[in-house]
From Swiss-Prot:
It is found in: Plastid, Chloroplast. Its EC number is 4.2.3.189, 4.2.3.190, 4.2.3.131. This is 9,13-epoxylabda-14-ene synthase, chloroplastic. InterPro entries: Isoprenoid_synthase_dom_sf, Terpene_synth_N, Terpene_synth_N_sf, Terpene_synthase-like, Terpene_synthase_metal-bd, Terpenoid_cyclase/PrenylTrfase. It is an enzyme of class 4 (lyase). Binds 3 Mg(2+) ions per subunit. The keyword Chloroplast applies. Disulfide bonds: none annotated. The Asp-Asp-Xaa-Xaa-Asp/Glu (DDXXD/E) motif is important for the catalytic activity, presumably through binding to Mg(2+). GO terms for biological process: gibberellin biosynthetic process; miltiradiene biosynthetic process. It holds the Pfam family Terpene_synth.
Amino acid sequence: MSITFNLKIAPFSGPGIQRSKETFPATEIQITASTKSTMTTKCSFNASTDFMGKLREKVGGKADKPPVVIHPVDISSNLCMIDTLQSLGVDRYFQSEINTLLEHTYRLWKEKKKNIIFKDVSCCAIAFRLLREKGYQVSSDKLAPFADYRIRDVATILELYRASQARLYEDEHTLEKLHDWSSNLLKQHLLNGSIPDHKLHKQVEYFLKNYHGILDRVAVRRSLDLYNINHHHRIPDVADGFPKEDFLEYSMQDFNICQAQQQEELHQLQRWYADCRLDTLNYGRDVVRIANFLTSAIFGEPEFSDARLAFAKHIILVTRIDDFFDHGGSREESYKILDLVQEWKEKPAEEYGSKEVEILFTAVYNTVNDLAEKAHIEQGRCVKPLLIKLWVEILTSFKKELDSWTEETALTLDEYLSSSWVSIGCRICILNSLQYLGIKLSEEMLSSQECTDLCRHVSSVDRLLNDVQTFKKERLENTINSVGLQLAAHKGERAMTEEDAMSKIKEMADYHRRKLMQIVYKEGTVFPRECKDVFLRVCRIGYYLYSSGDEFTSPQQMKEDMKSLVYQPVKIHPLEAINV
């Protein structure tokens, strides 16, 4: 016996969507589910959780039978379920349930007696990673025994590797040891071709390649492709009476709806770019598509359209003006842009001195005024002075860098790093986008030491990694770079090779990443977690762009990721119900 019901994906609502010109129509998918299905998710807490009912409530669907209740049994299944929801990009619909499950998991973790978490290696590794990422205080010492285990199961080794990447402190030697052991073993399995499971093989390759450069939505698309019709049976059970292949189809539909909106945002960016006449400039990089891709990769939620657009516009403007300071304009013209922003007043065309200066300044002027008006509605106060201040700050940093290499000013590495983190552009992009997350941000919050530290750490990561990949080019251009300064600082000592200097700079980037993670994962801070997560996502952009090349200037892997994230919908195959 089987039943048929309609899973209705309703239009998304929220501040960002309500102001958009376009809306998405409701989409209905007919799903047939067998009442004989034994798809059971086992949960290990003392209150039943109706995941199926919650799903119906979120997406506005209706079913022909009462809500399905999931009964508590197994903590391992709970954790696998959370991991699956995250990997398929639909965890945002289940945050209250996830929070409940993790709270229960944390209570078990704190128990001194041995329980199921510590008896199962994979369960312990997943629990540690999910709890730490959520902000719970969990010691890595609980993982210490596993570093000496003779583990042959590749999936378990992979979970230990992922857990080791949650290292926050320099003295967490357990995680350092676990990382070295697990990564070497996984690489050996790849070299030997000893992972027969295709999906697992691909996962190991992906996580080993650039773990901290994995962008949220890029990873979601990859998971959906791996969990295609041939592998949907590998998805952990979600709810009794809701077959896993139906859940996969829902996740695919959700992805395609988000993608459709991101395509529309690309059209909006292209219209804005042309309206600003930035397409008439005959120098520098056109990064409209790159900006749209990067913001779509870190802001997946449909309601964050305004945040994505604000972030993307600032990536484009900062890149255009940075290129102007570096190559496109004269020193006097570059100074003129800073003077105009400080004055913040439109002028007759002849007073700008050049067409390029006029285009760049008016693009900044009109864009900031427009964003400030929208932010006023969101925040309930005027934020234009802050937005102008951010532009003065980054342009001043550009000027300082311009002066340092044109006048051949001798800088130490510390002097360089004290200001160069601003010029990478993370601060201005992030603080603009935060205005549109539906969270009120006071002036005190934005001027706090915590805000400065978050900006400095994420910017330092991106700056240092950028310097490693652009060192040889910038050396030819006689431009100051942290790798070159590192070499110069050790010139009188033992010989330091370029590889040594690059390794040292990468270690500094990892240090700032861990400091950033400490703030993001800490409870009771000035910023709510939703805001702090943005800094962590931007940190991943740095690793994505600059881990093995300069993907921002010469995209290679990004071209493929851009196709799958922005342009190519997930193909939804008709899936038959599972009858047991």
